[in-house]
């Protein structure tokens, strides 16, 4: 939270305690991003996740073409990858829980740019 406040970001805290923000992106579009408040542990690593949604499937399963496109994009992404969260395609960047404000800002930027580009490609809309 300190890094988020230090940057002067406008945010809401959702029911899970996560930080929800909306940023302006190119082409008069906006993109939603969540900085998870919970920290995941793996061995000596403490990991914070940044999530940004791009697509909602009409059924529980993603269409094959969409799933394959998300996998291809995950390979190209410098930071993060696509995950399926229920019916939502979510771009997730994982960073050190003690990342600096600059590192957090870069991770947020990677998430919103990647998710917004995919949302535009798959849906031609700006719902997130």
Q: How does the language model describe each region?
A:
Residues 2-3:
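Short, small-residue-biased leader/transition segments that mark boundaries at the very start
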Residues 7-57:
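Ser/Thr-rich, low-complexity intrinsically disordered terminal regions
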Residues 30-32, 62, 96, 100:
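Poly-acidic low-complexity segments
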Residues 46-87:
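Short, internal acidic amphipathic alpha-helical interface segments
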Residues 65-67, 108-110, 124:
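Short, charged/polar low-complexity linear motifs in solvent-exposed/disordered segments
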Residues 74-114, 119:
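A short, solvent-exposed beta-edge/loop patch
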Residues 122-128:
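Short, highly charged C-terminal tails/helix-capping segments
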């Amino acid at each position: 939270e300190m890094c988020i406040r230090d940057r002067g970001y406008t945010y809401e805290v959702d029911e899970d305690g996560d930080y929800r923000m909306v940023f302006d992106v190119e082409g008069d579009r906006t993109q939603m991003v969540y900085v998870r408040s919970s920290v995941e542990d793996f061995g000596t690593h403490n990991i914070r996740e940044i999530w940004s949604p791009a697509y909602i499937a009409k059924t529980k399963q993603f269409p094959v073409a969409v799933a394959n496109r998300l996998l291809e994009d995950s390979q190209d992404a410098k930071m993060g990858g696509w995950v399926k969260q229920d019916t939502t395609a979510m771009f997730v960047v994982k960073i050190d829980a003690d990342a600096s404000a600059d590192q957090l800002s870069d991770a947020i930027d990677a998430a919103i740019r990647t998710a917004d580009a995919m949302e535009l490609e798959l849906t031609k809309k700006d719902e997130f």
